């Protein structure tokens, strides 16, 4: 587990509010220092996380690091179709979480 004293956690936030300050302003989200500036997104289950992961990488051309949380040890879960860079980022994330 990764424990830091300078982490700000907020939610639940809709995806647009988590990622875009303009959406937070339009929706009049108040009192959130994370809205529009999220560095990390958590999903309620592996299925919804996978949908976001696939959409981001395939339609957005992004590289993402993915890891399953809640296990005794870091668990990297990559897809056969993931790029080498996404696999490397996922391994690096798991190594950081293992410390």
For the regions a language model picked out, list residue spans one by one:
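Glycine-rich phosphate/nucleotide-binding loop
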Residues: 10-99
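Short, small-residue-biased leader/transition segments that mark boundaries at the very start
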Residues: 1-2
């Amino acid at each position: 587990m990764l424990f830091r004293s300078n982490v700000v956690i907020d939610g639940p936030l809709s995806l647009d509010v988590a990622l875009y300050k303009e959406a937070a302003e339009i929706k009049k989200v108040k009192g959130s220092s994370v809205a529009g500036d999220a560095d990390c997104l958590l999903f309620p289950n592996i299925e919804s996380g996978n949908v976001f992961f696939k959409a981001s990488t395939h339609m957005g051309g992004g590289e993402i690091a993915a890891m399953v949380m809640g296990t005794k040890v870091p668990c990297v879960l990559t897809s056969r179709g993931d790029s080498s860079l996404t696999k490397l980022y996922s391994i690096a994330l798991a190594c950081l979480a293992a410390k």
